[in-house]
Amino acid sequence: MSFKRDGDDSSQLNVLKKRRVADLLASYIPEDEALLLKNGSYACTVCHHRPVFNTIDMLSVHRTGKKHLGGLQRYYGKKLEHKNEIQKRRHFDFVRAEDAGEKPPPGPAPLLVQTKRITQNALLKSAPYNSCCSNKKVVANSRNVYDPHSGPSTTTGLNVPLDTQPGPSQPHTSLHSPPTGPCSSPTDEIPPNKNNSRHKKKGEEKFRKEIADPERERNMEHYLQLKSSGWIPDGTGKWVKDENVEFDSDEEEPPALPPS
C-alpha cells in the first residue's frame, strides 16, 4: 500500500524514507543492550543508571541520544578490554603448556562456533529469548500427602533424621505415617477418585466427537473461506462486504454453504 504525498521535494522524500527505515529497524536492538522486565517494560543496560521505558519506541528514541551514544562507547570499550584479557590469558596458558612439553587441549575454532550459532538461530522458528527474567516459579507446599507407592513420607519444614532407626521398645510414631494393622491397608484408606476419572473420560469423548464431526468441519471451512474472501459478520448473523476490500464481482450475498 502506497501513500500519496504533496509536492516533488526530494529532501522531503529522503526524510520520509529515513523515517520509514528507522521505524522498520526500531525493534532491531541487540539482546545485550536492552532488558525485558516482568511488567513488560524495557530497561537500557548500556547506560549506568538503567533507565526504564514503557514502549520500544521510547527506547528507540533514547538510543539516539548523546548520553546513550557516549555510554555505548564505554560499554563496548569495556567488552573489548574483557575480550582481549581473555585472549591474553589463553595465549599465556598455551605458551606455558608448550614450555612444559604438554599438549594443549584442542579447542573449537572461533569462526566455526560463530557459524554454528548463526545456523542454529536461522533454523529456529522464532528468535531465542534471552532475558534475566525467569517465568519459572517454584511453589513449595508444606503439606504432605501420603503416597503408598513412594514409601514413607518426608516433611518439608521439619528436620527429621531419616537414618535413625527406632528400637523395638520405642516404636516410631508420626502424624504423617499411615496406621498399620491387620484390617487396614494404604490402598483401602485412600480410594481412587472416581469423579476425576469420569470427568476426564467425558472430556476426551467430547473432544473426539468434535474432531470427528464432519458438519462442524464444513462450517469452519466455510467461515474461513468467507473471512479470506473479504466478508465480515455484522453481529446479527449476516455477512456484509468489507469496505477496504475490492471484489471482482458485484454480488451482494456471500456464497452459500456447499452441500455435503
From Swiss-Prot:
A motif (Bipartite nuclear localization signal) lies at residues 4-20. The keyword Hydrolase does not apply. InterPro entries: SCNM1, SCNM1_acidic, Znf-SCNM1. Residues 245-254 have a biased composition (Acidic residues). It comes from the Eukaryota. One of its GO terms (biological process) is alternative mRNA splicing, via spliceosome. Keywords: Metal-binding, mRNA processing, mRNA splicing, Nucleus, Spliceosome, Zinc, Zinc-finger. PANTHER family: SODIUM CHANNEL MODIFIER 1. As a component of the minor spliceosome, involved in the splicing of U12-type introns in pre-mRNAs. This is Sodium channel modifier 1. It comes from Xenopus laevis. The gene is scnm1.
